[in-house]
């Protein structure tokens, strides 16, 4: 077999249908576009989103208010109840939580949230604390340190 012997697979090369070239060609007269109407005329159809004069969807739905925060801080969050499993007087940081397997996906600096109860005293170092989280950690005898 040589390069000049290579032929395309049977049925892989389909000829383009020539429409509107007489009734015996199979797609004569209206060329498969139907009888009348805007979609059968030249210059084909309507723009995307046009609903025939009905108020289109993009104008029926109200505009969104506000604007996105440009420099939004994305935190890795953890609740106080997850910290309750750690032994007492442990220093809790993002790295230590990752090493212990409590946190797996790290999206950014650590933020401690106040859901759940805490019964052990811990030294927690994080970028941010919620008010509830701070009060629960300090009530258990621990300390909160905000990292810059």
Swiss-Prot record:
GO molecular function: rRNA binding; structural constituent of ribosome
GO biological process: translation
GO cellular component: a single term: cytosolic large ribosomal subunit
Xref: HAMAP family: Ribosomal_uL15
InterPro entries according to UniProt: Ribosomal_uL15, Ribosomal_uL15/eL18, Ribosomal_uL15/eL18_sf, Ribosomal_uL15_bac-type, Ribosomal_uL15_CS
Organism, scientific name: Trichormus variabilis (strain ATCC 29413 / PCC 7937)
SUPFAM superfamilies (UniProt xref): Ribosomal proteins L15p and L18e
Family: Belongs to the universal ribosomal protein uL15 family.
Biased composition (Basic residues): 10-20
Subunit structure: Part of the 50S ribosomal subunit.
Pfam families in the record: Ribosomal_L27A
Keywords per UniProt: Ribonucleoprotein, Ribosomal protein, RNA-binding, rRNA-binding
Main function: Binds to the 23S rRNA.
Keyword field contains Ribosomal protein: yes
Name under which the protein is recorded: Large ribosomal subunit protein uL15
Annotated stretches, region: Disordered: 1-57
Keyword Transport: no
Residue ranges with Gly residues bias: 23-35
